């Protein structure tokens, strides 16, 4: 059975990630794998005891799936991605502390690198997210880049799992009629795809007066969205593994879960 993998470090954010991961894994009918990446000097015994204690506390929530854990040593991003390959993970979920958390570098170092290096989509969850409600509305921004639509099958999969409504947000980054026409065409194609797939959705196009991130987040606020789906390849740097400004800003500023998808990842959780 395929697996949903969760990066775990005993933080509030990672505990929330486990909660949502259990829900997602139950709906996908995939096993759940928790991964703790320790430093060289950490004693594994108390780590193992605490993970087993916490797992026992949520075991009753599992619906026909298994939950296991593994303790690895090394760099967080490398070990998470390696474990994802080892257990045929279709999705990685990580909790983040955000810019106000006790470990500011987590969002800048471990999360960014995990997303950039991962072969599967990565769902990041902030510890200030409201987990009392389901994923009712999911925002899918569409720009004029050639691969912007490739995140739609993954978003549609989540929408069907949670009976969510997709909000397709066309982003006009220019007054140029050709560029706006490309966005309109892509939104129309997505609309047709989702109609055939019988996925609830609405389509909206807006101007981008500031930047893509701010406009997307303002729209997400206006519809009380529960998740945002972005592509990472189109924003990635050509000279390094680091994500581009749009993805970095979205991951840092969004208090909602962000699902980051690369073009070659569309066949994983969208199956």
State where each predicted segment sits.
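Charged docking surfaces used in two-component/phosphorelay signaling
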Residues: 71-79, 208-213
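Gly/Ser-rich helix-loop-strand patches that form or flank binding pockets
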Residues: 81-130, 221-271
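Active-site phosphate/pyrophosphate- and oxyanion-stabilizing loops and adjacent acidic/basic residues
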Residues: 22, 56, 112, 156, ...
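A conditional alpha-helix N-cap/helix-loop micro-motif detector
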Residues: 14, 73, 104, 148, ...
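Short helix-capping segments at alpha-helix termini
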Residues: 58-65, 194-199
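Small/aliphatic-rich secondary-structure junction motif
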Residues: 1-47, 137-186, 191-205, 222-227, ...
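Short, well-ordered secondary-structure micro-motifs
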Residues: 45, 105, 135, 151, ...
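Rossmann-fold cofactor-recognition segment
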Residues: 66-69, 203-205
């Amino acid at each position: 059975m395929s697996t949903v993998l969760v990066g775990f470090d005993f933080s509030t954010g990672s505990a929330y990630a486990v909660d949502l991961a259990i829900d997602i894994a139950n709906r996908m009918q995939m096993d759940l794998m928790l991964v703790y990446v320790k430093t060289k000097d950490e004693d594994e015994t108390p780590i193992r005891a605490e993970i087993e204690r916490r797992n026992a506390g949520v075991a009753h929530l599992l619906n026909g799936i298994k939950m296991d854990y593994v303790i690895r040593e090394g760099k967080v991003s490398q070990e998470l991605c390696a474990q994802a390959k080892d257990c045929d993970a279709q999705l990685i979920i990580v909790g983040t502390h955000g810019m106000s958390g006790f470990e500011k570098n987590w969002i800048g170092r471990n999360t960014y690198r995990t997303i950039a290096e991962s072969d599967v989509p990565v769902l990041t969850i902030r510890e200030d997210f409201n987990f009392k409600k389901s994923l009712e509305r999911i925002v899918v921004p569409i720009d004029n880049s050639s691969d912007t639509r490739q995140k739609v099958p993954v978003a549609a999969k989540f929408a069907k799992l949670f009976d969510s409504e997709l909000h397709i947000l066309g982003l006009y980054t220019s007054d140029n009629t050709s560029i706006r026409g490309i966005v309109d065409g892509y939104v129309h194609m997505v609309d047709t795809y989702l109609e055939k797939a019988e996925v609830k959705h609405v389509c909206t196009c807006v101007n981008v007066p500031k930047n893509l991130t701010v406009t997307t987040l303002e729209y997400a606020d206006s519809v009380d969205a529960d998740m945002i789906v972005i592509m990472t390849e189109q924003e990635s740097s050509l000279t390094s593994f680091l994500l581009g400004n749009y993805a970095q800003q979205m991951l840092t500023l969004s208090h909602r879960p962000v699902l980051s998808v690369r073009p070659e990842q569309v066949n994983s959780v969208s199956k």
